[in-house]
A protein has these predicted regions:
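Predominantly extracellular/luminal regions of secreted and cell-surface proteins
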Residues: 163-174, 330-364
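Short beta-strand elements bearing conserved aromatic residues within extracellular beta-rich modules
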Residues: 165, 417-419, 516-518
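Short S/T/G- and acidic-enriched coil/turn segments that sit immediately N-terminal to beta-strands
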Residues: 237, 415, 442-445, 535-539
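Aromatic, loop-rich ligand-recognition surfaces of beta-strand-rich domains
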Residues: 364-432, 442-487, 498, 506-508
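Short, solvent-exposed loop/linker segments at the N-terminal edge
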Residues: 494-500
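Recognizes extended acidic, P/S/T-rich segments that occur
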Residues: 517-539
Length: 539
């Protein structure tokens, strides 16, 4: 039977932190030849979230359902599939809004989809409010304004503008002229350019999609994703207006949600919502793009509006443990737990290795590399040395699907394991026991009940949902019990004379620093964007 330890008790697991990517039961993709030629994989994208009856409901692409949580950390899955044919999407880039005690829900369509509704969504049952929407709307988003008027924003294209329209709440038919809201201007906005580093001006024109509108202090903030979901620079920008249908003006600080570096990369095509305490959050799409270009995960980032009405998100340390809300936050820069990464580049051993999938891949801070054991059998293990006594506060286990045979959603998927620690590498003590776990936790995050001072950590497999025991990241967080690195010196920015949208940033290496955060913005007090650089002194 599963044991509680002084560091972890599965029956009383109420963490005060969470860690991106979000630990959701990501659905496996359908068994279609163009999707799975490199093997079965999980994915979702295009998330949005609403509060309904005091809980958070998260909707995202092709999940055969949705997720709900009371605390933004522990998530439960509800099966609510709408797929009609095996080759169809379930719901792509879904949209939802709440009116009174009713949750309304739909997905992307070029041919018309129902508008579903429910007053008990956790049952997974929905009724049809409208049999078929009147407009072909891909990537829809709704805004129910304070005056009761309903608006829809939509579009996904590298050729056409994103649009907005007012809808009749009785039948969801348009009752206004369809307005073109915005198009990309990559010639002016360098971050909107196509490519992994905004560096491809020849393959395709950049894409814009994922319209979403947030109303704050009487202003309408129109958010949009660009330049492509398969890139680490995928981000959300924002335009602002005094009216729900515009005209909208490009915000000087852009993109407002941006994360091109670190373990989790990409922060585009998302949605903004308020928590129970009035804090804003932005839930966004993260790139993985290993087995397939549209292989993706989801991240959740604190978001705010400054005294000048500038909308921004905080993605600095955005894939480290972040504090879950317990009240109103005065400054979203203070949502970082302070627990640093202890596992980057550290030595790793394993029970076995499948081909060239080496254990070192779990400590390189790349979600796009992974280690795999030769099997998924109980007893396969992975061990890390922290190269000295460290204070461990949290552990993130990023599983990867290697040789998996699962497709679509199944309700019998779960992970089971035990984690041990040792100071000398010889004598081991149980830290975390999830040998009875019945949840699917592909990015499991464990916050320890008290600090653990140790040198070695080992995870022993008991069960994986499908395929081999494989991981892209065995990430250990805490404190190194040493001195903090000194501040960076000799920071230089060289702007390209040929193209002022480009710049090279360099700095001197700092002893004992394993990574750097570059902060930048439109003013000294608005350095809202951050780029994490690991093991290098240039970007």
């Amino acid at each position: 039977p599963q044991q509680a330890t002084r560091w972890f008790d599965a029956t009383a697991d109420h963490p005060s932190t969470y860690c991106n990517p979000m630990n959701l039961s990501y659905c496996f993709r359908a068994n279609l030849p163009d999707l799975v030629k490199n093997g079965s994989f999980r994915s979702t994208a295009d998330p949005m979230m609403v509060m309904y009856k005091g809980e958070y409901f998260l909707f995202a692409t092709n999940q055969a359902g949705f997720y709900y949580s009371k605390d933004l950390s522990n998530w439960e899955f509800v099966f609510a599939g709408f797929q009609r044919y095996p080759e169809d999407d379930d719901l792509c880039a879904p949209a939802a809004f709440v009116s009174g005690d009713t949750l309304f829900y739909t997905g992307s369509t070029y041919a018309g989809l129902p508008i579903w509704y429910s007053t008990n969504p956790k049952s997974g049952k929905f009724k049809r409010y409208v049999e078929k929407t009147a407009l072909p709307s891909w990537d829809p988003a709704f805004l129910l304004d304070d005056d009761g008027r309903l608006y829809m924003y939509y579009g996904s294209s590298n050729e056409f503008a994103l649009k907005g329209v007012e809808l009749d709440r009785r039948d969801f038919h348009p009752i206004s002229k369809i307005q073109e809201i915005m198009m990309l201007r990559p010639e002016e906005h360098g971050w909107e350019r196509f490519g992994m580093n905004n560096d491809d001006s020849t393959t395709l024109a950049p894409f814009t999609e994922g319209a979403f509108v947030t109303k704050h202090n009487g202003k309408y903030y129109f958010q949009y994703g660009a330049p492509g979901t398969e890139f680490k620079v995928y981000a959300d920008g924002v335009y602002v207006s005094d009216k729900p249908m515009g005209p909208f003006t490009y915000q000087k600080h852009n993109p407002m949600s941006y994360k091109p570096g670190g373990f989790v990369q990409g922060a585009g095509h998302g949605g903004t919502f308020k928590d129970a305490y009035g804090n804003y959050w932005h839930v966004a799409t993260c790139m993985l793009s290993l087995k397939y270009k549209f292989e993706r995960r989801i991240g959740l980032y604190p978001t705010a509006f400054d005294k000048d009405g500038v909308m921004y998100s905080n993605t600095a340390f955005g894939d480290y443990p972040l504090l879950t809300p317990k009240g109103k936050v005065d400054d979203i820069a203070n949502t970082f737990s302070g627990w640093m990464l202890l596992s980057y580049g550290k030595p790793v051993m394993a029970s076995s290795m499948d081909s060239t999938l080496v254990p070192e891949n779990v400590t390189d801070e790349s979600m796009r590399t992974f280690w795999s054991a030769r099997s998924g059998e109980p007893g396969e293990w992975l061990q890390i040395s922290l190269e000295g006594l460290k204070e461990v506060r949290a552990i993130q286990l990023n599983y990867y699907e290697h040789r998996a045979v699962q497709h679509n959603k199944a309700m019998d998927l779960y992970h089971q394991y035990r984690i041990y620690h040792s100071i000398d590498g010889q004598n081991w003590e149980l830290v975390v026991d999830k040998s009875d776990n019945d949840k699917d936790v592909p990015h499991d995050y464990i916050e320890l009940r008290e600090p653990l001072k140790t040198r070695y950590l080992k995870i022993v497999n008991e069960h994986v949902p499908s395929g081999n025991f494989a991981m892209s990241g065995f990430r250990i967080f805490g404190n190194g019990l040493g001195e903090a690195p000194a501040a960076v010196k000799n920071l230089k920015v060289e702007r390209s004379k040929a193209d002022k949208r480009n710049a090279m940033i360099t700095w001197e290496p700092v002893k004992e620093a394993y990574a750097y955060n570059i902060y930048y913005g439109i003013a000294p007090d608005k350095l809202y964007n951050s780029i994490t650089v690991l093991g290098d002194t240039m970007y």
